[in-house]
């Protein structure tokens, strides 16, 4: 029972964190999704607590929180090269 409560709390915290990072950057969900290379549905799922960012996505959100300009510049370059 406690594990389920802890999991729900972790999902809520992840949702708040993802939303806070995006809003601090001043981006809509669509703009944020495009900038970080994921679907709008992924962003919505994170922010609604339906899914929790893991792995590289979780690390990226942490970097965007601490050094947004550098992270966005690197992402812009990476996405441009990929195209």
What are these regions (language model features)?
Residues 1-13, 69-83:
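N-terminal flexible/basic segments that precede or flank functional cores
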Residues 38-53:
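Recognition helix of helix-turn-helix/homeodomain-like DNA-binding domains
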Residues 55-73:
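DNA major-groove recognition helix of helix-turn-helix/homeodomain DNA-binding modules
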Residues 14-17, 21, 56:
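N-terminal positioning helix adjacent to the helix-turn-helix/winged-helix DNA-binding module
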């Amino acid at each position: 029972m406690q594990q389920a409560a802890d999991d729900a709390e972790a999902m809520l915290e992840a949702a708040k964190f993802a939303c806070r990072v995006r809003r601090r950057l001043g981006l809509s969900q669509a703009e944020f999704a495009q900038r970080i290379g994921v679907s709008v549905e992924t962003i919505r799922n994170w922010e609604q607590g339906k899914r929790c960012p893991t792995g590289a996505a979780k690390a990226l959100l942490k970097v965007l929180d601490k050094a947004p300009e550098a992270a966005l510049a690197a992402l812009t370059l990476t996405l441009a090269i990929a195209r």
